[in-house]
Amino acid sequence: MKKVLLFVILLLLSLISFSQMGLSQLAVNVPRNETIIANILSGRIGSPDNFNVWPATWRSPDRGIQQLMLEPLWIVDPATGKVINALAKDKPIYNSDFTKMIVKIREGCYWSDGVEFTADDVVYTVELIMKYKEMGYNASFNEYVKRVYKTDKYTVVFELKKPNARFHTYFLDRWGACRPLPKHVFEKVKDPIAFDFKPPISSGPYVLNSYDPGGYWVLWERREDWQRTPTGKLFGMPQPKYVLFYYYGPTEKQVLAQNNHQLDMADLTMEGLRSVLQTNKYARAYRKEFPYIVNVDPCVSGVIFNNAKAPWNNKEIRWALTLAIDIVDYVGLAYDYAVTVSPLHIPATPAYMEWYFKPLEPWLKNLTITVDGKPFKVYDPDVPMRIAENARKRGYNVPTDPNEIRKIFGIGWYKYAPDIAEKLLIKNGFKRDKDGKWLTPDGKPWKITILTPPNPASVNYRNAFALSQVWKKFGIETEVYATENDGTLMNVGDFEVSTSGQWPAREPWGGHPDLYRTMEQFNSSYYRPLGEYYPGHQCRWTNPQMDKVIAEMQKISWDSPKNKTLGMEGLKILAQEMPTIPTFTYPGVIGYDEYYWTNYPTAENPYCIPYHHWPNFKYMLPFLKPTGRK
């Protein structure tokens, strides 16, 4: 209730400054009914005059550069579970030992200035990046590329210094990739690092129209020759003639903008989403009903133990603290039950449900740990039913069909077993004082500091808050340490427990069953002592069985049927060892205003990942439908 009241107050304060704002103040001479307006997720643009995103410098790619201006060779879509061939017309072709990769270029694609996109652009992009250490992907390309060349206008050959069955993933867009640059522009530039690429030319379906020098907005206009882009060839004409990316600021200002029909796609908090759904009859969420959230995000949130420090290097302690979590209370505290729980170290998206969760559920039901010399089954398949029941008690409309409940809230999680957790802790020298508070083996009060970033609306912070409460209930003193330095502290191992960093496991590709991207971060070759920068997963956990899984994955194509088997083996090892705790899939909270446009991606029609900040946004635009309102 306090959160709602605070949100209303902030909303009213924002209204004072926003009430006079119209579209004419956002961009000049733009017909509103031909324009879709989306929020800039990453905030105000720090370098609005610079459109050169190839140097390893943050240049706000989500202002439309990655969504509209540039096409990749390939792009992955977590909603459909597919990899889309974009500027490449087919999958990469490898030789038997993965030391050569051939790329076939899609014919008939053109840069917006009329120059054809060819193999020359790809070859030049890679060679230029290898020449300048300030360029993104410089280290990776210099590590792997022996030679890159074309054999004809539409064929590129990469000869590699050493085998890499996933070399193509450097060009696979999933909120970041090496996207080809225009050779005919950059070859005339003396300094490609200092070059601002202004005005930019596009390989994608939109070109720059105008932008705010202050960094608040960028306006893009559909290319007249949109059909000569991968977007046009694959999906047809993008329906909006104009796309305006605008940074509105915090949620309350985005809510006001949507209520005034000046923002079609917003990045909201749950409080903001509830507000706009109540005040704008044209507003909707990804789901029509509770829990409203996006369930196709390829990230899983949760808890990270520092396995290089005691007692977190003890598997029994990690399991004790896992079983001390009542996940139903936890998700109620974190997101008012609006989540999909995940017992595995990958997101519980529909695609991964089919690839991994459902096949592994029988194994999860029989997963045991040893307590007092006896096996104890740790998995609880009834968790989603309990979440649904608690959500109903809060007044939410929740289905009663068990299958629907599992689709929404997940297949299950781990048991809340404080008695078992207590036995494991006592076995390892911990004990309770007369007030029931836990003491360490040396008799001192046990206090756990939980590291997290400072934004209370972030999923990381909400995990930390919920974790703090459930462990306190179990008798452990906790402190949430919220700091902007969380990333630095994690990189050098200066933490105990965290909900920040690289998630409980690095997110997978999202639209492909290959889990190498997730497992590879646990490779023991990355290990560094505390105090040194850690290039692998920040939990600093290593395991010889996981090393074997990773080594086998490196030997096979990511499309190999064996890959899924290896992925399952890796997930089993992570579940058994619990070096980190997965809690729930990242709950994306977006708001659509359907006053001017409809047919957004939704839970009923998940034809594309629904995020306007993802590079897939350009593939959403051909499917939008104008309402005809002026």
Language model segments and positions:
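N-terminal lobe/hinge region of extracytoplasmic solute-binding protein
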Residues: 22, 37-96, 127, 201
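A structural "hinge/loop" feature
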Residues: 39-64, 86-90, 115, 137, ...
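Detector for C-terminal structural segments
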Residues: 21-36, 40-47, 64-65, 212-221, ...
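Aromatic-rich, solvent-exposed beta-strand/loop patch
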Residues: 112, 159-181, 200-253, 274-299, ...
